[in-house]
């Protein structure tokens, strides 16, 4: 039902544009291509900066052998590639300005006339070096620059309605939702520094995403803060950043032109390479990279704005289609109701999409904070006949888990809850009384982890299997699963029959405590279910009242329009009769004049 609803939502919006715009791209797609190009441009600048630093560190070697130095040759190639990119930007600056200053409407641009393949320009190949500090001989290889922009841009895409088919396995808006990655989080420094206690993803702190209550996530409060702040921004985002970027790029181009005036086919020309100008070039590249980051952030903000408004248009299209099917008048929205109507649309149609996007975001976030080592990714082909490993205790007594471990557990808990909610929403879409898992209990840092039960008598006849017992530190989802296992195991005792899987039937102390804990948790679940059910009913009643007022206003407008038309018709009839009477009054005079002329 989730897939059908998303497809149904987009069919009405896409079908009107499919035939007329087969050869065109929408603004959001072009903005993504622009971001990809800027990302590739940024990587080329970083590679050139590293190359310049290597040359400066080995000046004494390069002065001795300029002609056949591969490090110097690679630097010249990179500078030529950068010069081509800068020339490309200068020639197509009108296209950049048009994309940055466009209005946030779903319009199309003609790719044949205006677009000069931003995507292909961003996919240029650049040369990079593998440096070996203990060896003067350098080896170089071609590397492909086709990496995507950022994970958060994929998260922003979670609102991209042109990619709705991809959202079932996705990302943006993300989405948490539509937040942009303002810095390149793919840097090696981020992978090395995994012990930091505060992680941020764009402008949204990760802790806010992990610690948010599931109930607040359903109501969309945090998401709507991002939506409102985006819609409140004025048009022409990043125009100053673009001007600074173009001016600095022009200066870089002139600098590169002076340095690279040589024929690369003849390696002897490297003798004239001006090493003394590299310091000034490096300083200019640092300034250029800073301006490039600001421009990239502005483009991502603009892309986020486009995608949010595109989601709103898709929602309006869906509501109109539903109204036509039910024979109701098409709903209209004023500018004052824009944000509130967008909020209703997200709550009505976007909650399931939100679940999948948040889960995808958390997976990518976990991979970035805790990157897997190469040794972990290598598959083990040989199968050894080893004894089964015994599960270790969560932690020794009195030992606190690390900060990274807490973050990892928080991410896993949120992902598990999303899986539970998503499953219940799909299977019980028409029933409001879905039993959600409660928020996991936050463990105090000073709390000791209980490794075993002191009250448990270590006798095999006192339990069936250890797996269905749970302690107070378990998540509610785990408890719910173990409740089901418990009910299945104790069902034969209730009927007086012995199950084949139960060999030892003896209700010990631990079993009684276990059943009491189950009853307590069931009562807690009922209370939370009742609270959520009441909130859903209040929200549904509020929507019904708004819809009734909306339809009543439409009917009143129709009545006023009919009365106005009737009055206009009456006035037209009165004027027509008056004109006819004046014409009839003039007719006899005209006949008398004609008779007098005949007599003469």
Curated annotation (Swiss-Prot):
Membrane topology: Peripheral membrane protein
Biased composition annotated in UniProt, kind: Polar residues: 128-141
Compartments where located: Cell membrane; Parasitophorous vacuole lumen; Secreted
Region (8 X 6 AA tandem repeats of [VT]-N-D-[ED]-[ED]-D) location: 143-190
GO CC terms: extracellular region; plasma membrane
PTM note: Not glycosylated.
Ranges for the Sequence repeats: 143-148, 149-154, 155-160, 161-166, 167-172, 173-178, 179-184, 185-190
Subunit structure: Forms a complex composed of MSP1, MSP6, MSP7, MSP9 and MSP3; within the complex, MSP6 and MSP9 mediate the binding to the host erythrocyte. Interacts with MSP1 subunits p19 and p42; the interaction is direct. Interacts with host SLC4A1/Band 3 protein (via the 5ABC region). MSP1 subunits p19 or p42, and MSP9 form a co-ligand complex that interacts with host SLC4A1/Band 3 protein.
Identification of the protein by name: Merozoite surface protein 9
Organism: Plasmodium falciparum (isolate FCR-3 / Gambia)
Gene name tied to this protein: MSP9
């Amino acid at each position: 039902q989730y897939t059908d609803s998303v497809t149904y939502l987009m069919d009405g919006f896409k079908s009107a544009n499919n035939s007329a715009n087969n050869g065109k791209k929408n603004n959001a797609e072009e903005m993504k291509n622009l971001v990809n190009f800027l990302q590739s441009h940024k990587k080329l600048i970083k590679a050139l900066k590293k190359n310049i630093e290597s040359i400066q560190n080995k000046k004494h070697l390069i002065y001795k052998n300029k002609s056949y130095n591969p490090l110097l040759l690679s630097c010249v190639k990179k500078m030529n590639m950068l010069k081509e990119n800068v020339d490309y930007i200068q020639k197509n600056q009108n296209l950049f300005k048009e994309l940055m200053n466009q209005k946030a409407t779903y319009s199309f641009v003609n790719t044949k006339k205006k677009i000069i393949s931003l995507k292909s320009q961003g996919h240029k190949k650049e040369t990079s070096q593998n440096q070996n500090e203990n060896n003067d001989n350098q080896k170089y290889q071609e590397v492909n620059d086709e990496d995507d922009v950022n994970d958060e841009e994929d998260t922003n895409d979670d609102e991209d309605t042109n990619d709705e088919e991809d959202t079932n396995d996705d990302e943006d808006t993300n989405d948490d939702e539509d937040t942009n990655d303002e810095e390149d989080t793919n840097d090696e420094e981020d992978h090395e520094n995994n012990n930091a206690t505060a992680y941020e993803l764009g402008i949204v702190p990760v802790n806010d995403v992990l610690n948010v209550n599931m109930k607040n996530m359903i109501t969309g409060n945090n998401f709507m803060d991002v939506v409102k702040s985006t819609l409140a921004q004025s048009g022409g985002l990043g125009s100053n950043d673009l001007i600074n970027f173009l001016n600095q790029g022009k200066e870089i181009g002139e600098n590169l032109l002076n340095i690279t005036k040589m024929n690369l086919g003849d390696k002897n020309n490297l003798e004239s390479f001006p090493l003394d100008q590299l310091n000034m070039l490096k300083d200019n590249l640092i300034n250029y990279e800073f301006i490039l980051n600001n421009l990239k952030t502005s483009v991502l903000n603009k892309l986020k704005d486009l995608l949010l408004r595109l989601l709103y248009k898709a929602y309006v299209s869906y509501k109109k289609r539903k109204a036509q099917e039910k024979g109701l008048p098409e709903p209209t929205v004023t500018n004052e109701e824009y944000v509130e109507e967008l909020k209703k649309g997200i709550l009505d149609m976007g909650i399931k999409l939100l679940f999948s996007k948040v889960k995808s975001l958390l997976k990518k976030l976990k991979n970035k904070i805790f990157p897997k080592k190469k040794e972990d990714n290598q598959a083990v082909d040989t199968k050894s006949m080893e004894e089964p490993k015994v599960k270790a205790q969560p932690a020794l007594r009195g030992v606190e888990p690390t900060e990274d471990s807490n973050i990892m557990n928080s991410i896993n808990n949120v992902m598990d809850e999303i899986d539970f909610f998503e499953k219940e929403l799909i299977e019980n879409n028409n029933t409001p009384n879905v039993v959600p898992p409660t928020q996991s209990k936050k463990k105090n840092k000073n709390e000791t982890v209980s490794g075993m039960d002191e009250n448990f008598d270590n006798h095999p006849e006192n339990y069936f299997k250890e797996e269905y017992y749970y302690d107070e530190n378990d998540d509610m989802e785990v408890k719910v699963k173990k409740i089901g296992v418990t009910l299945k195991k104790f069902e034969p005792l209730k009927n007086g029959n012995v199950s084949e899987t139960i060999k030892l039937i003896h209700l010990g102390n631990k079993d009684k405590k276990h059943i009491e804990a189950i009853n307590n948790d069931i009562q807690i679940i009922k209370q939370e279910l009742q609270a959520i059910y009441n909130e859903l009913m209040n929200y549904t009643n509020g929507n019904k009242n708004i819809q009734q007022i909306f339809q009543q206003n439409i009917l009143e407008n129709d009545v006023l329009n009919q009365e106005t038309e009737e009055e206009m018709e009456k006035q037209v009839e009165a004027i027509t009769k008056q004109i006819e009477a004046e014409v009839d009054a003039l007719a006899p005079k005209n006949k008398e004049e004609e008779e007098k002329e005949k007599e003469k």
